[in-house]
């Protein structure tokens, strides 16, 4: 997984889907340090690395995962070239992320023109909006429990609490969330 962050998704996949090896990579050294200290799963390892220069040889992975990380990449097309380089022939790229209405077409075009075959593409914005709505109260409680008071407003915006800018942008379709499954030829 490129952009594994705090490692929760990587840990879940390693424990429940039991791949031979699962590698979580992130460009935040503090996150990788946390992941290495917190997760103790036999088939899971974490490394520091840059999505624009994935530190693995060509044709190395069966599957590469990228969830809610790429919206922060300055050179998305370079990242896609790296994905294609490190995937084995017939390997899969599983991708999910959001963009605002101005940049969603660029994202879709970049993925479709990546040189990998698009197996599936779906707009899941409505699902994300409904999930934010459904999980609203639990996330509010977490904000008030774990964040100092001066960060409450920021926390509400960051996690998309009802009526926040993030929440409303999914509701009014100014922000869209897509997932793709691509395959290297």
Role assignments for model-derived ranges:
Residues 91-97:
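Conserved beta-strand signature within the Rossmann-like core of class I S-adenosyl-L-methionine
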Residues 52-64:
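A short acidic, Gly/Pro-enriched loop at the edge of an enzyme's catalytic core
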Residues 63-74:
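A short SAM/SAH-binding and catalytic strip from SAM-dependent methyltransferases
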Residues 3-7:
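Class I SAM-dependent methyltransferase "Motif I" SAM/SAH-binding loop
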Residues 126-132, 140-183:
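Conserved Class I S-adenosyl-L-methionine
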Residues 116-127:
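Conserved S-adenosyl-L-methionine
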Residues 77-89:
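A short glycine-rich, Lys/Arg-flanked "PGG" loop and its adjoining helix->strand segment in the class I
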Residues 8-53:
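Class I SAM-dependent methyltransferase SAM/SAH-binding core
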